[in-house]
A protein has these predicted regions:
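Retroelement reverse transcriptase polymerase core
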Residues: 1-209
């Protein structure tokens, strides 16, 4: 199935939703000194930076903004590169896009007996950052100063922006057999045959989008 490539090959297409970072009026660019890293972390940092550069997700930056980076160990022992955007988040105007209420989600599922969940791996990288806001995503490392062209993890409005995109994509099927919660899609049906049909529709949409 070509719906789920092992890795995203490069920049996503232009979409009706772009990720914007509106900051409080009068905010000056914030730059934070890079954190210390162990030798093993530095090797991993160099490798992950190169991968992000090769895919076009980041580019070298001259921005006056700059967040530090750190690693978080995942369950499988591998290291996830995280940008510490806490200072930027403090001055970002919050997006009020509503996340769904959990009790509303359960109401939709009450007659369903068959479920599938799709976790959109690296889903945030499907959304481009608005060009004028790219410099605000900048981060500093021992190996240089970079900025994101796609929406990175850790920004305060990222979940709402991705939710907005997913709801637009699946608008026709919400409250029928699809629940979207940030980067998870739940498909629910009353019967297995109905579920197979619902899955085909969702996978086709994902392939096209």
């Amino acid at each position: 199935m070509d719906v789920f490539p092992e890795e995203l090959p490069g920049l996503p297409p232009d979409r009706e939703v772009e990720f914007v970072i509106d900051v409080l009026p009068g905010t000056a660019p914030i730059s934070v000194t890079p954190y210390r890293m162990a030798p093993a972390e530095l090797r991993e940092l160099k490798s992950q930076l190169q991968e992000l550069l090769d895919k076009g997700f980041i580019r070298p930056s001259m921005s006056p903004w700059g967040a530090p980076v750190l690693f978080v160990k995942k369950k499988d022992g591998s290291l996830r590169l995280c940008i510490d955007y806490r200072q930027l988040n403090k001055v970002t105007i919050k997006n009020k896009y509503p996340l769904p209420r959990i009790d509303d989600l359960f109401d939709q599922l009450k007659d369903a007996t068959v479920f599938s969940k799709i976790d959109l791996r690296s889903g945030y990288y499907q959304l481009k950052v608005k060009e004028c806001d790219v410099p605000k995503t900048a981060f500093r490392t021992r190996y240089g100063h970079y900025e994101f062209l796609v929406m990175p993890f850790g920004l305060t409005n990222a979940p709402a922006a991705f939710m907005d995109l997913m709801n637009r994509i699946f608008q026709s099927y919400l409250d029928r057999f699809v629940v979207v919660f940030i980067d998870d899609i739940l498909i629910y049906s009353k019967t297995e045959s109905e579920h197979a049909q619902h899955l085909r529709i969702v996978l086709q949409i994902l392939r096209e989008k």
